[in-house]
């Protein structure tokens, strides 16, 4: 086993070295890019159409959960290469008060990816919406279509190209790939900015769980998403902006402005859907339960020195997540494994192999992150600067019987050209859980190390 780990580490080091040579060469070309791919539609530059390309490539070493198998072979650890996100965004102000937005792409493509046995990527439209401005400014916009616009949290509708941490706190995308399409829903919304208030109200038509592409979860004594009733979902998000107003072009919310804006917000959000969940009572009668999600949060992006262009970034959020009795869901981002032979895992909560952990559940969650942006060109004019960060997620879920799902991340972004060209290094420590005589107990902690290269234009 030790020899295997040594060989794997040697392969990882050599792989990282080769990739960095390519990254540095390509990043120099990106750093020379000054203009957006933006096309003006009139002489007065009042209307436009813009295209953005983005790719996030991961190199990852993961310490596997107990019993993990890859292609039928037990693996105590894995090293994989994958495309976390590959996206094309197309949007524009096509008339003085008319806006349209499309996003096309794919996610989580690695060597164990399979679409019904087919490794070929299945890209799809993430967003397709039309929006009309009823005011002269941003006071009121009405939109509809397939959209990320929703309630709960800024991280429920994140701009993935501006993330500070390696990835977003996915638990905030509370129904992802259950009754939505990768966190997007068919919705009608109103959003706007009135004085210092940024608001959005959303009515969504959730997808039925039967269209997930696989078999639906069987009903049990623990709550799961209902395969029968499908009521409309109501969402609200309200944010009070103490300093500068945040960008309002699309419904997405920025991860970090890298000190280019002075932002301090306090916000609250909610999602409600009647009878979204179901379970059995005494293994016989069916009981429907409401989906109730609530969050209060604060976001800070504060420049410190105009000449140095250094800044601090911070976020803190408190979530109350009620999916019904004992709801729990494991999830692992771009899971490097595809099976398990473990016998003592929590059942009925999704795949517990690879890098997964209890990410969603009925209970309460505290999430916080903090980062510091060093001065501009810290490493030299052509090598950019650094942005170290740390984040913590503490989930107290009902089904874990008092055990805490605590996840810690520390990392650093090497900003070669802001968000357009950056290399991120991230270390994660996550919990594992076992089931003994129907009692949930904590297993050993597992770790993961990721290098990501993000390029966008």
Q: What feature does the model see in each segment?
A:
Residues 1-35:
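Bacterial Sec-dependent N-terminal signal peptides
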Residues 35, 69-73, 169-174, 218-221, ...:
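Extracytoplasmic loops and strand-loop junctions of Gram-negative outer membrane beta-barrel proteins
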Residues 37-64, 76-209, 230-246, 320, ...:
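Outer membrane beta-barrel
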Residues 40, 75-78, 116-119, 175-179, ...:
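Outer-membrane beta-barrel domain signature
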Residues 44, 243-398, 406, 443-447, ...:
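Detector for outer-membrane/organellar transmembrane beta-barrel domains
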Residues 46-48, 95-97, 137-139, 194-196, ...:
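Strand-connecting loop/turn motifs
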Residues 63-70, 111-123, 155-161, 211-218, ...:
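Outer-membrane beta-barrel translocator domains and adjoining extracellular loop/strand segments
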Residues 222-226, 417-456:
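Predominantly the C-terminal beta-signal and adjacent terminal strand-loop region
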């Amino acid at each position: 086993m030790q020899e295997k780990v040594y060989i794997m580490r040697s392969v990882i080091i050599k792989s990282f070295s080769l990739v960095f040579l390519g990254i540095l060469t390509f990043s120099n070309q990106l750093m020379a890019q000054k203009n957006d791919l933006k096309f003006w539609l009139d002489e007065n530059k009042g209307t436009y159409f813009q295209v953005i390309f983005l790719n996030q490539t991961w190199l990852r070493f993961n310490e596997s959960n107990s019993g993990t198998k890859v292609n039928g072979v037990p693996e105590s650890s894995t090293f994989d290469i994958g495309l976390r996100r590959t996206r094309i965004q197309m949007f524009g102000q096509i008339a003085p008060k008319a806006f349209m937005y499309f996003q096309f792409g794919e996610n989580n493509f690695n060597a164990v990816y399979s679409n019904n046995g087919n490794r070929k990527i299945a890209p799809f439209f993430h967003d397709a919406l039309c929006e009309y401005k009823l005011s002269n400014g941003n006071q009121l916009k009405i939109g509809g279509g397939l959209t990320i616009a929703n309630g709960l949290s800024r991280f429920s509708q994140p701009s993935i190209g501006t993330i500070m941490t390696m990835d977003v706190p996915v638990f905030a995308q509370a129904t992802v790939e259950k009754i939505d399409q990768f966190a997007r829903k068919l919705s009608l919304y109103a959003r706007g900015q009135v004085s210092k208030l940024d608001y959005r109200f959303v009515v969504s038509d959730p997808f039925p769980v039967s269209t997930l592409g696989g078999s639906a979860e069987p009903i049990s004594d623990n709550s799961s998403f209902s395969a029968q009733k499908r009521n409309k979902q109501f969402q609200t998000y309200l944010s009070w902006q103490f300093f500068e107003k945040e960008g309002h072009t699309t419904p997405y919310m920025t991860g970090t402005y890298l000190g280019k804006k002075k932002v301090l917000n306090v916000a609250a959000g909610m999602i409600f859907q009647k009878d979204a969940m179901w379970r059995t009572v005494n293994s016989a009668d069916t009981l429907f339960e409401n989906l109730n999600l609530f969050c209060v949060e604060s976001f800070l992006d504060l420049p410190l020195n105009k000449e140095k262009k250094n800044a601090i970034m911070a976020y803190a959020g408190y979530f109350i997540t009620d999916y019904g009795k004992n709801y729990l869901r494991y999830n692992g981002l771009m899971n490097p494994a595809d099976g398990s032979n473990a016998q003592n895992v929590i059942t009925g909560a999704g795949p517990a192999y690879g890098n997964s952990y209890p990410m969603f559940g009925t209970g309460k969650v505290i999430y916080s992150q903090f980062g510091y942006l060093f001065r501009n060109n810290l490493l030299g004019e052509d090598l950019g600067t650094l942005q170290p960060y740390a984040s913590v997620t503490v989930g107290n879920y009902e089904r874990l019987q008092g055990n805490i799902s605590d996840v810690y991340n520390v990392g650093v972004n090497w900003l070669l050209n802001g968000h357009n060209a950056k290399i991120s290094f991230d270390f994660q420590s996550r919990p594992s859980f076992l089931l003994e005589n129907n009692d949930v107990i904590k297993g050993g902690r597992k770790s993961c190390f990721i290098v990501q290269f993000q390029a966008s234009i």
